[in-house]
Amino acid sequence: KMKRIVLISVLFSFVFLSHAQIWKVPEGHETRWTSFENPTGAKGTAAQANKGAKGSAFGRIMAGDSCVLLSQQGPGIINRIWLTVSKRNPKMLRALRIKFYWDNSVVPAVDVPLGDFFGNPLSRTSRFENCFFSNPEKRSFNCCIPMPYRTGAKVVFVNTSDEDLTHLFYDINFTKLPEWDSEMSYFHAVWREDKSTKLGVDYTVLPQLSGRGRFLGVSLGIFANKAYETTWWGEGEIKFYIDG
C-alpha cells in the first residue's frame, strides 16, 4: 500500500510540474515568429503586405541567390523551424542549403544541404517522424531542436543550383531571452559526402571534437555496393570515443 501511495504521489507531481510549464509565463521571455509575412519577427509588424490578409506567403530564390530567414540580436533560442519548397527532387534538395550563424560569427555552425539537414539523406524524401525532425507528407520539413544563442543568430537559405526556386515557404519560432544561461550550449552540425569507403578501414562519421557537449544523433544515407545486393551490407559496429 505504501508503494502505491508513493507511486501515485510521484506521478501526480510529474504531471503537475509538466503542466506548470504550460501556464507559467517566464519573466522577460518574448515569443516571436519570422516568415515572409514578418521577416524581422518584430511585434506588431505581421500581415502588412495585403491589408491584414495573407499577402506574402512565399518567396522566390533565384539561382545563385540566398535569403535570410532569421536575423536577431541579443540572447534567444530557436524553438522550431518549418519550411517547404516547390522543387523537391534529389538534385534540388542537395543544391539548396541551410546555414546557421551564432553570435555574429562569419563562420557558420551549420552548413548542410536542405534534404540532408532535415533527415532525408541522399535527398530522397520519405514520411517519417522522430523527436527532432519530421516530414509527415513527404513535402514539408520540420525541426524542433532547441538552438540557443548568446548575442545573435542568423539563418540563411541558399540556392546553389542553376535553377530558380519559385516557391519557398517557411516560418521560424524563437524566444527572446533576458539573459544567457551558462548551462546552454550551441547547436552544430557537420555534413560529409564520400563516394566510397575502404574495406577494413573505419569510416569517421563525426570528426574529433573537444569541449563539453551532447551528441544528438546522426542521419546516414548509403548506396550499397552491388556485391551485397542479395545480402545484408550493414555488418560492423558503431564506435564511440568519448573523453579520449
Go through the PLM ranges and name each one.
Residues 5-15:
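Sec-dependent N-terminal signal peptides
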Residues 16-20:
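Sec/Tat signal peptide C-region and signal peptidase I cleavage site
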